[in-house]
Design a protein with these regions (language model features):
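Short, Lys/Arg-enriched, disordered terminal segments
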Residues: 1-4, 107, 111, 148
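Conserved residues at the C-terminal ends of beta-strands
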Residues: 67, 89, 120, 143
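Short coil/turn motifs at secondary-structure junctions
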Residues: 69-71, 91, 124-126
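Residue-level recognition of the GNAT/N-acetyltransferase active site
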Residues: 84, 89, 93, 122
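Conserved acetyl-CoA-binding loop-helix of GNAT-fold acetyltransferases
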Residues: 88, 94-107, 130, 134
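Conserved active-site alpha-helix within GNAT-family acetyltransferase domains
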Residues: 99, 123-142, 148
């Protein structure tokens, strides 16, 4: 299957928005040229956020979002790339798209000379855990995930 990985920018916000709609609602809508909300544009144009999408047959079918956070002190400015979200539409899974998207995190690690890449995975999502392990990620076990 032919595909391309594209960085999300102001030229492809509407296609990205269509994919987010697909994920949230479970069905695909007609491709739109509708303007994306100003809030979404603002978030997607954040220079610290890196969003890439897989494009197949003119539409996006998956994405990864990453951030780089520099560290001070013992890290000497070499922080980590954090994978915030990785998703591929279920009917497109098994084509290597998630692995291709994770390579974008590797590229960011190299770009920033980062110490490493960090992500979290839900304990109830063994498929994702297996994917990450197949891509070289290892369970660290030294952190507790907390939210407020």
């Amino acid at each position: 299957m032919n595909y391309a990985i594209e960085k999300i920018d102001e030229n492809n916000h509407s296609l990205f928005d269509d994919m987010v709609f697909w994920r949230e609602h479970g069905y695909e809508r007609e491709p739109s040229q509708e303007p994306v909300s100003e809030q979404i544009k603002k978030e997607l144009l954040n220079p610290d956020l890196y969003v890439y999408a897989v494009k197949v047959d003119g539409r996006y079918v998956g994405w990864i979002s990453c951030v780089y956070i520099a560290k001070v002190g013992k890290w000497k400015g070499h922080g980590h790339v954090y994978v915030d979200e990785l998703w591929v539409e279920p009917s497109y899974r098994g084509n290597g798209f998630a692995k291709a998207l994770l390579k974008k995190a590797d590229e960011l690690k190299d770009k920033f000379n980062a110490t490493g890449i960090r992500l979290y995975v839900n304990v109830n999502n063994p498929v994702a855990k297996n994917l990450y392990e197949a891509c070289g990620y290892v369970e660290d076990g030294r952190a507790i995930f907390m939210e407020k």
